[in-house]
Amino acid sequence: MTYAGFWRRFGAYFVDFLALTPLIAITIYGTNLTRWFQALWLIPGALIGIWFSVHLVVRYGGTPGKLAMGTRIVMDDGSPITRKAAFVRYSVLFGLSMLTSAALAYSALQIPEDHYMSLGFVQKSMLMTAAAPPWYKGVNLAMNVWVWSEFITILFNKRKKALHDYLAGTVVIRKAA
């Protein structure tokens, strides 16, 4: 197996970000439309995340970014990734994302509707962050540390494994030509 290196994996992450850009647009639009959007988007957002990061990985061996960069995710022994392993790979980011989303939904609902609607998107975001429960900052910090640690870990091991690969017993390899 030829392991996918840092830049190929970073490129896949960037392609996935681009693929999810329409969802970012929906979030911006919805956030500007009503303060209820954050709460209403929790379940659909979670389901889309699971579909993208678990279902597509099991079905095709990777996310669109991984596939576009000529890589695939397999078990450590080279066999196809299992559903359980795909979920374990995504579980930490999923949990942290759900907690931050729930905190922002809670804070949005604490803001009076007329005040919320009088603000621009950036002002709404800043106000929701300021009004979030006290644990939000710790969870948000943990999520940032997790994401950066993923990339740093790839740099310092021969198999180019990220933390989630160690948890799930997976590795990202280059597809055979």
Predicted regions mapped to residue ranges:
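Membrane-interfacial and juxtamembrane segments of integral membrane proteins
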Residues: 1-177
